[in-house]
A protein has these predicted regions:
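A conserved acidic beta->alpha catalytic loop
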Residues: 11-15, 38-39, 61, 65-66, ...
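A short, conserved alpha-helix in the catalytic core of glycosyltransferases
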Residues: 129, 139-164, 200
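Short, acidic, metal-binding catalytic loop of nucleotide-sugar glycosyltransferases
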Residues: 18-32, 247-257
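A conserved hydrophobic helix/loop-capping motif in glycosyltransferases and polysaccharide synthases
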Residues: 4-13, 230-241, 245, 252-253, ...
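Conserved donor NDP-sugar-binding/catalytic core segment of glycosyltransferases
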Residues: 65, 70-102
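Short aromatic/hydrophobic "clamp" motif used to bind/position activated sugar donors
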Residues: 57
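Conserved small/polar residues in nucleotide/adenosyl-binding loops
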Residues: 200, 286-290
Length: 290
């Protein structure tokens, strides 16, 4: 019996065959299935759960070509057995404009909620955990099913970052990263975003983190405030991005005073030192080291 059911997105025959070619060296391990419907719909995840018979499920979230490195799937199986994780995801390379660049991902932490958390395009699931998670989803989704599944799995299992470069993505979305970061405010994505919010709300209720939207009117005229607003940045090990984040705040022009609060969660990669360099800035920067 083969150990992995691979579900590959099918757009057209040429594209699909390119994806299948990545698994030519792993035919003894994998069953390959064509996936013609969106991976982000509940019906699709239910279909996968019904069809999967192997111990593990491999999903690709992109329809573009990739290259699996030597014994990549054997390594994922080994780590899945060792960790008993519900989901494994790995560091990888990307080829952009004919150049190969490193694309490391980060550890999944308790409380991670971002619907655009970067797992890379290869997701490796424990089949039993996958099936239980899918059948426990409370409502049907057209866009947020995979997000809701990941949140569900995180409540009961480990989601493990494999700190090894196991594959290479052929990147075809050449927009600048800043353009991608603000996809969520695009009006065309409004329905998708509403679904993500519903999935997140269900998760927060499940973990006891949901706060009812009950508000008390506050009269801000009763007490004078030296600072009208605060920008708060929670951070851990973001040496490559924290400088840009601070600079974006420093460049804001207002007719009122505001401060910047950086909550540093035990960074050990040089992030703390970069934050401290800005303590003398005219802007009030408060560095809280948890």
């Amino acid at each position: 019996m083969k150990k992995i059911d691979c579900f590959l997105p099918f757009i057209n025959e040429e594209q699909y065959q390119q994806l299948c070619a990545a698994f030519e060296d792993f035919t003894s391990l994998v069953n390959i299935h064509a996936l013609k419907e969106s991976l982000y719909q509940s019906d699709t995840l239910q279909q996968i759960a019904k069809e999967a018979t192997a111990s593990y499920i491999l999903l690709l979230t992109k329809d573009t070509p990739l290259i699996l490195h030597y014994r990549a799937l054997q390594r994922l199986i080994q780590l899945a057995e060792d960790t008993q994780a519900a989901l494994l995801y790995a560091d990888h390379y990307q080829i952009k404009a004919q150049k190969r660049i490193n694309s490391p991902v980060i550890d999944y932490q308790l409380g991670s909620l971002r619907d655009d958390f970067n797992f890379g395009s290869l997701l490796f699931f424990n089949t039993a955990a996958f099936k239980t998670g899918v059948f426990n989803l409370k409502e049907p989704y057209q866009h947020a099913a995979l997000y809701a599944l990941r949140l569900c799995l995180s409540r009961h299992h480990q989601l493990v970052h494999v700190n090894e470069y196991l594959y290479t993505e052929i990147e075809e979305d050449n927009r600048k990263s800043g353009e991608k970061q603000f996809d969520y405010v695009d009006p065309r994505n409004q329905e998708r975003q509403k679904e993500m919010e519903r999935a997140c709300t269900e998760h927060l209720k499940a973990v006891g983190g949901y706060l009812e939207p009950v508000f008390k009117e506050v009269d801000f005229n009763l007490t004078p405030f030296e600072y009208e607003a605060s920008v708060i940045i929670p951070v851990k090990n973001r040496v490559g991005t924290i400088e840009a984040a601070i600079q974006s705040v420093l460049r804001q022009q207002t007719n009122f005073k505001f401060n910047l609060i950086v909550i540093d969660n035990h960074s050990d990669d040089g992030t703390s030192e970069i934050i401290d360099q800005h303590k003398g800035d005219e802007l009030s920067l408060i560095h809280i080291s948890e």
